[in-house]
């Protein structure tokens, strides 16, 4: 018997859950692993909330959805190239879940756009709504996961105390780098054709 796409994805999700559970059992530092697991659970909940708005039935409004109607697992997280596919399940009425695609406004693509172009265009169209609140940090992200990673990795004491002696010579640019190669790359890609 041939498995449909939804069954394959559920199976993949179950395999990943088992792998994670095995890592939890093998890990010696239970306290550290519980923190990691908490982050993992928060990420899954946030991702499901974001997906809920993408994968609703066309005949249902957001206000009509209940907790039972939410997806059983995160389709996009496991299978990135969903495109125009339809998935069965997840909605209590058994209706099809349609993955919405917005029409492309870029004429260079001939009105069509693939998944790679779609995400790139959304990121460059000012969709960065999650901003870092630390004073002096102007980083913005398209998802809460990017911001969460930035807060965890970008503002750690280890990262904050790195000596960066190579300063961009252009006025108004306060970028600093650990080595000369980083500065050269920055000047070539961000200040090409400008004079210092």
Swiss-Prot record:
Superkingdom in the source lineage: Eukaryota
Keywords: Metal-binding, Repeat, Zinc, Zinc-finger
SUPFAM superfamilies: beta-beta-alpha zinc fingers
A GO cellular component entry from the record: nucleus
Zn finger intervals (C2H2-type): 130-155, 166-191
Keyword Membrane appears in the UniProt entry: no
GO molecular function list: zinc ion binding
Keyword Zinc-finger appears in the UniProt entry: yes
Protein name: Zinc finger C2H2 protein ECU03_0940
Lineage: Eukaryota, Fungi, Fungi incertae sedis, Microsporidia, Unikaryonidae
């Amino acid at each position: 018997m041939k498995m449909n796409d939804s069954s394959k994805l559920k199976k993949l999700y179950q395999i990943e859950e088992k792998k994670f559970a095995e890592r939890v059992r093998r890990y010696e530092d239970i306290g550290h692993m519980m923190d990691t697991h908490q982050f993992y659970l928060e990420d899954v909940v946030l991702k499901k909330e974001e997906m809920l708005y993408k994968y609703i039935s066309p005949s249902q409004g957001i206000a009509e959805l209940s907790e039972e109607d939410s997806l059983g697992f995160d389709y996009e997280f496991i299978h990135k190239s969903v495109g125009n596919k339809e998935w069965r399940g997840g909605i209590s009425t058994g209706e099809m879940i349609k993955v919405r695609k917005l029409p492309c406004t870029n004429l260079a693509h001939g009105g069509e756009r693939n998944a790679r172009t779609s995400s790139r265009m959304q990121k460059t169209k000012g969709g960065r709504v999650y901003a870092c609140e630390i004073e002096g940090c102007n980083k913005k992200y398209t998802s809460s996961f990017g911001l969460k990673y930035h807060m965890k990795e970008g503002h750690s004491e280890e990262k904050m105390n790195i000596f960066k002696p190579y300063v961009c010579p252009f006025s108004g640019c306060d970028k600093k780098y650990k080595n000369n190669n980083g500065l050269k790359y920055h000047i070539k890609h961000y200040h090409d054709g400008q004079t210092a």
